[in-house]
Amino acid sequence: TGEKPFSCSTCGKCFLDRSHLTRHQRIHTREKPFSCSVCKKCFLDQSSLTRHQLIHTADKNFSCLECEKCFSKQSSLVSHQRTHTGEKPFSCSECDKCFAFSSELIVHQRTHTGEKPFSCSECEKCFSKQSSLTRHQMIH
């Protein structure tokens, strides 16, 4: 039916099931309880950690013809190749600015929406990018 009965008390976004809501809420709390035993990088959920761990264990059968960098997934190679080609397939519907990576578009769109999902635990100041919060936290 498309009903999404589980809603986030912080931002109001709704979800089909409780597990998706729980994962989403970690965005607001910055909780990343799943840690890579190799490099210590942390993740919101087990599936993201499992996917990440491939970079440490999987065969890297996909290599870039430009720089010979190797990847375990073809999608990672395709994404990397944009650094050489300059291709920017992700465009903003508000201003038509284009980006090479979907993550860059998501961050950019916050300039239009005003969304600031990263908040300082010391002073409550909010930021649109994690890197801006990290830089800010150095003043405390």
Curated annotation (Swiss-Prot):
Keywords, comma-separated and alphabetical: DNA-binding, Metal-binding, Nucleus, Repeat, Transcription, Transcription regulation, Zinc, Zinc-finger
PROSITE patterns listed in its UniProt record: ZINC_FINGER_C2H2_1, ZINC_FINGER_C2H2_2
Major location category of this protein: nucleus
Cell location: Nucleus
Domain of life: Eukaryota
Transmembrane segments: none
InterPro entries named among the record's database cross-references: Znf_C2H2_sf, Znf_C2H2_type
Gene Ontology biological-process annotations: regulation of transcription by RNA polymerase II
GO cellular component: nucleus
Pfam families on file: zf-C2H2
C2H2-type zinc finger locations on the chain: 6-28, 34-56, 62-84, 90-112, 118-140
GO molecular-function terms, A-Z: DNA-binding transcription factor activity; DNA-binding transcription factor activity, RNA polymerase II-specific; RNA polymerase II cis-regulatory region sequence-specific DNA binding; zinc ion binding
PANTHER family documented for this protein: ZINC FINGER PROTEIN, ZINC FINGER PROTEIN 771
Family per similarity comment: Belongs to the krueppel C2H2-type zinc-finger protein family.
Function as written in the Swiss-Prot or TrEMBL entry: May be involved in transcriptional regulation.
Name of the molecule in the record: Gastrula zinc finger protein XlCGF71.1
Species, as recorded: Xenopus laevis
